[in-house]
């Protein structure tokens, strides 16, 4: 009898928690009863595996489904859409409830869109080529390299404030342009968040090398990634609560360990 009563109490608690999560999101999503999540076109490893977020494979895809579950949405109630990075950070109405594309939370962006609390704090890493393998992994050693980067990302302020290159860095439109500039010997190195740097070094550069990393707690302006939402979105409180619960339970750390485990093997820049 006691066991039956206890099981009933647990079931009631779980039902109450699920109902509360669903109540939080009720009437606040673009499509009632469904959560619309945007990602890039394409979406890249290790954030999304094989450009197929609906599989739940890859760090951001897995986090999206975990957050959705915490908010009371079944996997079949998660709808994926695509949106460009640059358009997403502009003010105005959105065709998604949340968007995950490694959006760094910055005061400037936060004036025109809303962000969730961070779901990942990213170390910044130096991407270069094997020809620069002997470059000292120190700020002083990196200063003399020819640097490039994507103008609209937070990597540029980190580069200028943490490394302060001897020459002005060259600016490009996106990650692909930076990689092509490196292949053409226009630049020697660029800063990316660590998982992206690892992917680019392994997949897009034949002789790519991640020389070192600045831990998130040491680099000025290091990236904290948040889910992006339309400014004033009432869903924000629900999303924040879900991420907080996943953080407290250790689930976020488990997802990070599963999909971003390579990040621990990169030397720290002194």
Task: State where each predicted segment sits.
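Periplasmic-binding protein-like
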Residues: 41, 121-128, 194, 202-243, ...
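Extracytoplasmic small-molecule ligand-binding "clamshell" domains
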Residues: 23-102
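Ligand-binding clefts/hinges and TM-proximal coupling segments of bilobed small-molecule sensing domains
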Residues: 154-170, 209-210, 241-270
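Alpha-to-beta junction loops
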Residues: 73-75, 93-101, 145, 184-192, ...
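Extended ligand-binding regions for polar small-molecule ligands
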Residues: 61-71, 132, 145-146, 153, ...
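Acidic, polar ligand-binding/catalytic clefts
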Residues: 77-141, 216
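Bilobed "Venus flytrap"/periplasmic-binding protein-like clamshell domains
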Residues: 42-43, 54-70, 104, 125-177, ...
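A ligand-binding cleft/hinge motif common to bilobed small-molecule-binding domains
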Residues: 86-87, 103-112, 158-161, 188-221
